Amino acid sequence: MGNNQSGGPDARYGGPNDKAGLRRHRMMSETAKIAGQVLPNPDGGPPMIFDDGNEDKSGECPVVFRWSFTQNAQPRVVHIVGSWDNWQTRIPMVKSTNDFSTIIDLQPGQYEYKFQVDGSWVVDDNQGKAQDVHGNENNMINIQDSDFAVFEALDEDFQSSTAGEVLRGESESTKNHDTPNDRELEKLRSFTQEIPSMDMLRKAAGPPVIPPQLMQVLLNKETPESCDPNVLPEPNHVMLNHMYALSIKDSVMVLSSTQRYRKKFVTTLLYKPV
Amino acid sequence: MFSHQDRDRDRKEDGGGDGTEMKSKSRSQPSGLNRVKNLSRKLSAKSRKERKDRDSTDNSSKMSSPGGETSTKQQQELKAQIKIGHYILKETLGVGTFGKVKVGIHETTQYKVAVKILNRQKIKSLDVVGKIRREIQNLSLFRHPHIIRLYQVISTPSDIFMIMEHVSGGELFDYIVKHGRLKTAEARRFFQQIISGVDYCHRHMVVHRDLKPENLLLDEQNNVKIADFGLSNIMTDGDFLRTSCGSPNYAAPEVISGKLYAGPEVDVWSCGVILYALLCGTLPFDDEHVPSLFRKIKSGVFPTPDFLERPIVNLLHHMLCVDPMKRATIKDVIAHEWFQKDLPNYLFPPINESEASIVDIEAVREVTEFQRYHVAEEEVTSALLGDDPHHHLSIAYNLIVDNKRIADETAKLSIEEFYQVTPNKGPGPVHRHPERIAASVSSKITPTLDNTEASGANRNKRAKWHLGIRSQSRPEDIMFEVFRAMKQLDMEWKVLNPYHVIVRRKPDAPAADPPKMSLQLYQVDQRSYLLDFKSLADEESGSASASSSRHASMSMPQKPAGIRGTRTSSMPQAMSMEASIEKMEVHDFSDMSCDVTPPPSPGGAKLSQTMQFFEICAALIGTLAR
């Protein structure tokens, strides 16, 4: 079996060889295009779309509506009607395991809606509600812009989650298992000049064991004579940005550090009298 | 080619442990291909009609006539379907811990995708928002034939939809369970694809951390697709990872021990376990009793059946080496003779280093076409010429260039197979793999970290460099002295934990942003501790919000003195301080711009970030010594 990467087109067109060949040919033509090419798609998938859901309609974004039911009270048919089109259209909802649901594209804002379950008009008590000017009760939803930007939505959810609270130091008793980088943790703390108490230092868990990678010192490596003496071995990424030093000798302190610079690395030394 | 049951199933969401995974499968009904096509076509036509009707209704504020209204209602009655973006949601493939996975059909192309639906409230209460964010961050720009593709992410008020590549062959795990241990050639083919994908991840500074057969899916042609990047993380310069994650049977010893690790070495260990499972049909470390399992992993002793050939045993021992410093690297695995046999060219396209400095105009244009980045081509070009290789535009550019190389090789493969010009390779002469040639060439120019040869005479003459400063006091006393010294020097700090502090000089003005450094106390042995100083680069201000999460996780190199923007293409010489001498060692002189000494900027040259870092270190060391 060859390592054929054109799985998608073959699966779609099945048996006929000429169609498969035609599909491959078209894919190759598409790959060869220069103008208008978004990204090459080796597997012939849909073109890469890099947006946050704001599709062809200006400002309209998808909103999920659900009607949940229990196993012993399953409705036969559910529709939803809402103020987004002035209550004009009864939209049928699709049945799934535990609910009926649908997705409607809406502009951000406030909307009222109602469900029709097996012919009866119903308001879901578990979703937001409001009364209209005629005194009727409807469900109500408020759509924000930030709900449709993926990373903004996730950041909001993270801030209000247990992990977010723990990282800000607000509730230290709660244990959380979502452990991001220390860099993410740093963004949540503020600078101070308050010295932690000795009691706090003693209660803390001990410092971590030093990783073996840090004990590999770049400048301690012997360079073979065939190499340029100014060329050092390629460091791995965890060795970068750390400070290495020589013992103070003849009243001179010597420090060094290696940083990434474009596709190379630079090691800088400082000789400083003390 | 083994024939296996064709199940239309995508991978299940994995909660990070085997115990939490819900095994609920949904199988699509077998049906005639023509009938399915006709049905899809009808649905597509209805979808277009529906949109047209909705637009006209929205555009008109008038009340429609009774007849028209009835007609509209009747049409609406027929179209009970869910559409997200351009995809119509179909049957459920499975239910994971965080939500369902459904089949999606692209409404115009009829292309099939997998739609993972994550309920925002549920992922928040389960405390995995960060995990989801990392998966989206790390996966959205990846393009590799053996990594599952994330086409699109759509956020709604209640749910997040991840539009992913649909893979119909099931899990490699089920394949091994069904077939038992595989023949060498088949196992090698799978393993080569896995290593190619993992190497791609590492080249782009992403470590997977949850590699196991359950997360390796198979497509129709039995090719591997690496999936589930929920435990992955971005590797940043100078930083270690510590999270003990992944499945116990596949986790490296340092991970289950809670030690710090760099990243790639734990993926190598997991790949070693997978290779063993492919060849033997069992796991090298296995025990129902978790403490016993952990003891086995830490011992690194595993059974080697007689049917395993000697080269494979050597490779397995090198990959499943307990000491991460002695463990095989991805490069070692790729260079291994067993791995090199029957290795397809497309898996490791040659890196043309002579072109590394040439800007690919097409790739620049493609970066600008991303809707997320509303930028001009000049901005992309200046980002590439700037001093920040982790700029989000540079990242996007490099991914596109890398993806083009892979796509070119894959296209060549398709052409070859289409015309059947070259039948299956016979035992012809073995050509050296480009990676090997590059490695052998580079080894002559650049020494490696493994070179431990030293002459006695030179050793006596040369002083030894050491990391940070050492002490044999108690850790709490060391840190207390450090805090006191910092206060004396008028520094300020953030306490991440009592032994990890972020430090900077107190700014003279609110607008000033002095460079920061990280202090971390490490334990060296029972009575010895080491205070490590690490420079932290400035975060670039004004970065795009969509990339801020990724950008913040990146470590940035030092900026040249006096110039902080990314538009400059020159690096002025750092100003020499009075009574201090700077010596710059450049690893490779091929980049001649490092030797250029342009005049300092008109605004007056400042100290480079590296020099400022050195000054803070020297001041703190001096104060502590007193």
From Swiss-Prot, chain B:
Disruption phenotype: Shortened life-span. Temperature-dependent hypersensitivity to stress, slow body bending, abnormal modulation of head oscillation. Reduced survival following oxidative stress induced by the superoxide paraquat. Reduced survival as a result of hyperosmotic stress induced by NaCl. Double knockout with aak-1 results in reduced glycogen accumulation. One of its GO terms (cellular component) is nucleotide-activated protein kinase complex. Transmembrane segments: none annotated. Residues 1-24 have a biased composition (Basic and acidic residues). Its EC number is 2.7.11.1. The modification Phosphothreonine is found at residue 243. ATP binds at residues 93-101, 116. GO terms for biological process: cellular response to glucose starvation; determination of adult lifespan; negative regulation of protein secretion; negative regulation of TORC1 signaling; nematode pharyngeal pumping; positive regulation of autophagy; positive regulation of dauer larval development; positive regulation of protein secretion. Residues 1-77, 541-568 are annotated as: Disordered. The active site is at residue 210. Acts as a sensor that couples lifespan to information about energy levels and insulin-like signals. Role in motility and response to oxidative stress. Involved in the establishment of germline stem cell (GSC) quiescence during dauer development. Plays a role in axon regrowth after axotomy in PLM neurons. Plays a role in the maintenance of glycogen stores which are necessary for resistance to hyperosmotic stress. Plays a role in the regulation of flp-7 secretion from ASI neurons. Belongs to the protein kinase superfamily. CAMK Ser/Thr protein kinase family. SNF1 subfamily. This is 5'-AMP-activated protein kinase catalytic subunit alpha-2. It comes from Caenorhabditis elegans.
